[in-house]
C-alpha cells in the first residue's frame, strides 16, 4: 500500500530522526575509550611515540602526515589501510584551529564515525528504495536499521569499522544502480566504492566476489542477446584500471617495502584468555554446552563465548561490553535484548531463504539483485567462519566483521511481511520490532548514563 508522500516522508523523517538522536546521545556521552576495539591510546600533550592501536595510528598521521616509515606489522593495528585514520587526522587538524583543549580535540575524533553512521542510514534507505516494497514495509525495514544496537555502537567506534561498512553498502547500492543503467559512470561508482573501501579495511574486498558474479551474469546475458559485448568488456577493463591500483596500493606498498603478505592478520597468542582452540569444533561451530547455556541465561550472564552463534547474537547487540560491574537489572535488560535480537535474526534468516531462494518468483526480485544479495550473504558468512576457525579467539567471532549481513535478511523480511496474508504475522513482527526498539533505546541510555 502506498501512503501519501507527505505522510510517508514525515514518518520516515521521524524514524531517521530517532535513529540519529540515539546515535548522537551515544556519542555525546561515550568517550573514545569506552566500548572500543583495538584502539590503544592517544596523548597529544605528550607528543608522539610509536605505540600501538587505532588512536596511536591516527596520532602518528596527525603529527607526521605520512604513512608510517616502519614495517606496519611490527606496530599493533598499523597494518590497516589508512583512509579512515587519515580522515580522522585531517578532522583533528581542522578542529585544532578552533579547539585548543587537547582532551576535547582527541574526543572530536568521534565526529568521523558519527557522520559515517548517519550516512550508513542514508545509503541503507537508498538500497531499500531499489526494491518494490510498500511504503509501510520500507518504514519497517528502516526502523530496524535505525534502532539496531550494532549500528548505534558504530557511531562512536573510533576504529575503521563504520567507514568500512559505509563503503561496503555503497558497493551494494552502486551495483544495483549499474544493473539498472549500465553506464560507465555508474560502473565507476562501484570501482571507487570497492577501492576506497579497501583503502579503509581489507574485508570490504569480500563484496567484490558477488559483484563479479553480477558482472558475469550481465555479460553472458548481453552476449546471448546481442553478440560479443566488446563495449561492456571495455567498460570492465576501465573498472579494473581504476579499482585495482587504488584498492591494492597500500598492500602492494607494504609487500614491496617490507615483504608483508598481501593478506596479513594480527594473531593473539595461544595463552590469551580469548583463545578457543582447545574447545571441540562441534561446540564452537554448532552448539554450545547446553547446561552452560541454560545456567548463563538463568543467572543473566552472557557466556559461551567460544560458540560462534552465541557470539554473533551477543556482540550484535552488546558488542564486547564487559558487564561485570553492572547491576542485575541491566544484565536482565541485556539478556532480554539479546533474546529479542535472536528472534528477529532467526525470523529474518528463515524468510531470507524463502524470499531469495525458494519462492523468488513470487516476489519478482530481479536476478542480478538475487545474485548480489545471496552472494553477499554467503560470501561474507563463509569468510567470517573461515576466519573464526583459522584464528580461534573470541574477538575473531565479533559481529562487526559481518555487519553487512544485517541488510540482506532485513530486506527479505520486508518482502515476506508485505506478501503474507496473515494479519497476526504482521502484528507479531511489528510488536517484536517495537519491543526490540524499546530495549535497544534503554540499553543506549544505560551506556550513556554509565559512561566515564
Identify the residue ranges that each predicted region occupies.
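Short acidic/glycine- and proline-prone juxtamembrane loop motifs at membrane-interface regions
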Residues: 150-164
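Transmembrane-helix motifs of polytopic, lipid-linked glycan transferases
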Residues: 107-132, 170
Amino acid at each position: 500500500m502506498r501512503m501519501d508522500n507527505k505522510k510517508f516522508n514525515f514518518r520516515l523523517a521521524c524514524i531517521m530522526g530517532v535513529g540519529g538522536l540515539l546515535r548522537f546521545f551515544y556519542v555525546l556521552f561515550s568517550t573514545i575509550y569506552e566500548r572500543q576495539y583495538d584502539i590503544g591510546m592517544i596523548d597529544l600533550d605528550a607528543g608522539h611515540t610509536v605505540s600501538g592501536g587505532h588512536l596511536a595510528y591516527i596520532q602518528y598521521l596527525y603529527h607526521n602526515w605520512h604513512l608510517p616509515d616502519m614495517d606496519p606489522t611490527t606496530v599493533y593495528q598499523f597494518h590497516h589501510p589508512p583512509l579512515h585514520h587519515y580522515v580522522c587526522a585531517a578532522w583533528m587538524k581542522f578542529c585544532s584551529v578552533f579547539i585548543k583543549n587537547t582532551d576535547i580535540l582527541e574526543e572530536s575524533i568521534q565526529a568521523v564515525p558519527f557522520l559515517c553512521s548517519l550516512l550508513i542510514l542514508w545509503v541503507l534507505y537508498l538500497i531499500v528504495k531499489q526494491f518494490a516494497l510498500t511504503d509501510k514495509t520500507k518504514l519497517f525495514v528502516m526502523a530496524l536499521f535505525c534502532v539496531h544496537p550494532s549500528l548505534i555502537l558504530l557511531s562512536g567506534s573510533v576504529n575503521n569499522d563504520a567507514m568500512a561498512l559505509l563503503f561496503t553498502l555503497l558497493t551494494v547500492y552502486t551495483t544495483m544502480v549499474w544493473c539498472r543503467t549500465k553506464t560507465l559512470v555508474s560502473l565507476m561508482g562501484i570501482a571507487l566504492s570497492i577501492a576506497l573501501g579497501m583503502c579503509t579495511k581489507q574485508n570490504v574486498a569480500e563484496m567484490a566476489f558477488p559483484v563479479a558474479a553480477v558482472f558475469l551474469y550481465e555479460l553472458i546475458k548481453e552476449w546471448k542477446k546481442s553478440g560479443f559485448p566488446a563495449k561492456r568488456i571495455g567498460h570492465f577493463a576501465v573498472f579494473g584500471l581504476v579499482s585495482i591500483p587504488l584498492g591494492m596500493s597500500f598492500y602492494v606498498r607494504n609487500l614491496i617495502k617490507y615483504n608483508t603478505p598481501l593478506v596479513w592478520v594480527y594473531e593473539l597468542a595461544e595463552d590469551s584468555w580469548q583463545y578457543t582452540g582447545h574447545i571441540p569444533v562441534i561446540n564452537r561451530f554448532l552448539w554450545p554446552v547446553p547446561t552452560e547455556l541454560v545456567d548463563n541465561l538463568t543467572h543473566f550472564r552472557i557466556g559461551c563465548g567460544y560458540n560462534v552463534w552465541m557470539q554473533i547474537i551477543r556482540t550484535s547487540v552488546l558488542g564486547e561490553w564487559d558487564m561485570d560491574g553492572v547491576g542485575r537489572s541491566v544484565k536482565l535488560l541485556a539478556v532480554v535484548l539479546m533474546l529479542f535480537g535472536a528472534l528477529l535474526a532467526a525470523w529474518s534468516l528463515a524468510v531470507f531463504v524463502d524470499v531469495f531462494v525458494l519462492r523468488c518468483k513470487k516476489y519478482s526480485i530481479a536476478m542480478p539483485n538475487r545474485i548480489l544479495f545471496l552472494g553477499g550473504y554467503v560470501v561474507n558468512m563463509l569468510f567470517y567462519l573461515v576466519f573464526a576457525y583459522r584464528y580461534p579467539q573470541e574477538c575473531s567471532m565479533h559481529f562487526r566483521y559481518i555487519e553487512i549481513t544485517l541488510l540482506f535478511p532485513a530486506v527479505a523480511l520486508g518482502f515476506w511481511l508485505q506478501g503474507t496474508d496473515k494479519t497476526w504475522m504482521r502484528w507479531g513482527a511489528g510488536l517484536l520490532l517495537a519491543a526490540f526498539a524499546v530495549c535497544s533505546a534503554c540499553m543506549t541510555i544505560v551506556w550513556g548514563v554509565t559512561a566515564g
